[in-house]
Amino acid sequence: MPKKKKALTPLPYLASIVFLPWWISLSFNKSLEPWVTHWWNTRQSETFLNDIQENNVLERFIELEELFLLDEMIKLDEMIKDYPETQIQKFRIGIHKETIQLIKMHNEDHIHIILHFSANIICFAIFSGYSILGNEELVILNSWVQEFLYNLSDTIKAFSILLLTDLCIGFHSPFGWELMIGSVYKDFGFAHNDQIISGLVSTFPVILDTILKYWIFHYLNGVSPSLVVIYHSMNE
């Protein structure tokens, strides 16, 4: 009985690894959002602004200006002459309200960046703590995975490796990498930059492909040569 209980110990450990970071991130965002909002609005901090984000804000203001003024530019003189002062005042108030709304949206973006970045740091600290304190559970989980892989046939193993490699470094993988890197890039508070994301998308698959080839050559050739033969046959 104690042996069976010990064998089942990694199950709650695995469940906590999966669900605890999500729960902490959600609770953290809900509990600290009012405080962060107050802190950001009162201090009007510019610590988290970078050049790319400033350019994005300027672009939004330019778009707002074009939205309100471009269509009216030709009729501006007639509007001033023919429109009463109250209509012109309403027009200015409308621009002022839209500008305030844009500033609020800009502040909300930065508040969410701070919350997500802080939650990511906390999740990373939790994972690190679990890795250090849960040595025994990790050993048992590792033995489970190794036993599961050992019981698979070489054909299934080769098919799984081929499927994973096609998903990660195959012909259609750049689109998935672009979505994933863009999501992580945004989640950590960096402004969207097509050049940087394109560079990462073109670099990561190449690095993974090199690591995979080294792993197949250095490790699988010694452990299971038949698996390597089946993999190359499927790949061809």
UniProtKB/Swiss-Prot annotation:
<keyword id="KW-0472">Membrane</keyword>
<comment type="similarity">
    <text>Belongs to the CemA family.</text>
</comment>
<dbReference type="Pfam" id="PF03040">
    <property type="entry name" value="CemA"/>
</dbReference>
<keyword id="KW-0050">Antiport</keyword>
<feature type="transmembrane region" description="Helical">
    <location>
        <begin position="196"/>
        <end position="216"/>
    </location>
</feature>
<keyword id="KW-0934">Plastid</keyword>
<feature type="transmembrane region" description="Helical">
    <location>
        <begin position="8"/>
        <end position="28"/>
    </location>
</feature>
<feature type="transmembrane region" description="Helical">
    <location>
        <begin position="113"/>
        <end position="133"/>
    </location>
</feature>
<dbReference type="GO" id="GO:0009706">
    <property type="term" value="C:chloroplast inner membrane"/>
</dbReference>
<dbReference type="InterPro" id="IPR004282">
    <property type="entry name" value="CemA"/>
</dbReference>
<dbReference type="GO" id="GO:0015297">
    <property type="term" value="F:antiporter activity"/>
</dbReference>
<feature type="transmembrane region" description="Helical">
    <location>
        <begin position="161"/>
        <end position="181"/>
    </location>
</feature>
<keyword id="KW-0813">Transport</keyword>
<keyword id="KW-0812">Transmembrane</keyword>
<protein>
    <recommendedName>
        <fullName>Potassium/proton antiporter CemA</fullName>
    </recommendedName>
</protein>
<keyword id="KW-0406">Ion transport</keyword>
<keyword id="KW-1001">Plastid inner membrane</keyword>
<dbReference type="GO" id="GO:0015078">
    <property type="term" value="F:proton transmembrane transporter activity"/>
</dbReference>
<dbReference type="GO" id="GO:0006813">
    <property type="term" value="P:potassium ion transport"/>
</dbReference>
<keyword id="KW-0633">Potassium transport</keyword>
<keyword id="KW-0375">Hydrogen ion transport</keyword>
<keyword id="KW-1133">Transmembrane helix</keyword>
<comment type="function">
    <text>Contributes to K(+)/H(+) antiport activity by supporting proton efflux to control proton extrusion and homeostasis in chloroplasts in a light-dependent manner to modulate photosynthesis. Prevents excessive induction of non-photochemical quenching (NPQ) under continuous-light conditions. Indirectly promotes efficient inorganic carbon uptake into chloroplasts.</text>
</comment>
<keyword id="KW-0630">Potassium</keyword>
<keyword id="KW-0150">Chloroplast</keyword>
